[in-house]
Amino acid sequence: MRHRKSGAKLNRTSSHRKAMFRNMVTSLFKHSSIKTTEAKAKELRKLADKMVTLAKRGDLHARRQAFSIIREKDVVHQLFNDAPSKFASRQGGYTRITKLGLRSGDAAPMTTIELICDEV
């Protein structure tokens, strides 16, 4: 039984899943919006929100925790410099998922996931 197990497996090994989400969260913060399947976007939202929360905290330990996930120095620096001002008024829900329809090859539901910024 799979009671109380959180997170989707997405038909991948744990190492593949971990590497895929690390790459996806890096791309999300680099480009501020990416196109992916609905299931991946829903799982990515959890990780992205955790990274923004770490960036808002801003201390050295939070930065090191972010480096363990993101692994690109310039993306982490950009996130930690911009996040406190971009997401100052939000306590969570830093991403938005928008449905795009079905992919033509396999009819997988496609979405865009983007960062919601509060800048004026």
From Swiss-Prot:
Query: From which domain of life does this come?
Result: Bacteria
User: Which of UniProt's keywords are assigned here?
Assistant: Ribonucleoprotein, Ribosomal protein
Q: Which InterPro entries match?
A: Ribosomal_bL17, Ribosomal_bL17_CS, Ribosomal_bL17_sf
Q: Which GO terms describe its cellular component?
A: cytosolic large ribosomal subunit
**Pfam families, from UniProt?**
Ribosomal_L17
The answer to whether the entry has keyword Amino-acid biosynthesis is no
Q: One GO molecular-function annotation for this sequence?
A: structural constituent of ribosome
Would I find Ribonucleoprotein among this entry's keywords?
yes
Supply one GO BP term.
Answer: translation
Q: What family name appears in the similarity comment?
A: Belongs to the bacterial ribosomal protein bL17 family.
> What HAMAP family does this protein's entry cite?
Ribosomal_bL17
- Quaternary state and partners of this protein? Part of the 50S ribosomal subunit. Contacts protein L32.
Protein known as: Large ribosomal subunit protein bL17
Q: Which organism is it from?
A: Desulforapulum autotrophicum (strain ATCC 43914 / DSM 3382 / VKM B-1955 / HRM2) (Desulfobacterium autotrophicum)
